[in-house]
Amino acid sequence: MLVHRLNALKDNYVFVLEDEAARTAAVVDPAEARPVLEALVRLGLKLVAIFNTHHHHDHVGGNRELLEAYPGIAVYASRRDRGRIPGQTVELEDGDTVAFGCERARVIFVPGHTHGHIAYHFAGCGHLFCGDTLFAGGCGRLFEGTARQMQHSLGRLRELPGETQVWCAHEYTLGNLRFAHTLEPDNAELAERLRTVEVLRARKIATVPSTMAAERATNPFLRWESRQLQRAAGAIEPEEVFAHLRALKDRF
């Protein structure tokens, strides 16, 4: 399975998944339809499915137009987002599996950013599509869920293999790492990653995907055991550390 990263809106990423043998495609979180339709023509692919992680408009805004161009395709999303996902045909629960070509994704329920947020983990090829739950160097805001939910969700994701490719839906990495560095100035791996990302963004080069290993080493929202982060948060319990760090990031 190939993954094609498309730019959309201001800073969104949309992902077109390609089944090379069947010449079919699925799209993850189509913020808008036009870049997807153009990519399908360019790549010579037929769209067969949409995978939505949550209901926010910048993740489902292209659904209707894609359904007009490809009527009858499957639209996967959380059962908890029933009525909020345009064209949804399949309601997913934690632990469900969805197939695309020869690959299968496990659905991981990751509430926090929204009540119904899910992620798709293609273990066979090592890809995670996590929407706005886990970002490169950061995590999503708590719009509907609680800090406890989000910390638990991130804890589930950080247990995935280190080589997992983390495909998040926004280019927020530079700001996230600058914030992280204020909290852990002695984290050498974080400092090196920040320098690398500064160079990449100066050249308008994308920083997505990252890897789960890089996130575990440098993302403060996965590092609640860090003594330095515990001191910054004034807490020890993982949920409390996360909540304090998220509040600090909201004001950064």
Swiss-Prot record:
Its EC number is 3.1.2.6. It catalyses: an S-(2-hydroxyacyl)glutathione + H2O = a 2-hydroxy carboxylate + glutathione + H(+). Keywords: Hydrolase, Metal-binding, Zinc. It comes from the Bacteria. One of its GO terms (biological process) is methylglyoxal catabolic process to D-lactate via S-lactoyl-glutathione. Zn(2+) 2 binds at D58, H59, D132, H170. The keyword Metal-binding applies. Its cofactor is Zn(2+). Binds 2 Zn(2+) ions per subunit. Monomer. Belongs to the metallo-beta-lactamase superfamily. Glyoxalase II family. This is Hydroxyacylglutathione hydrolase. It comes from Gloeobacter violaceus (strain ATCC 29082 / PCC 7421). The lineage of its organism: Bacteria, Bacillati, Cyanobacteriota, Cyanophyceae, Gloeobacterales. The gene is gloB.
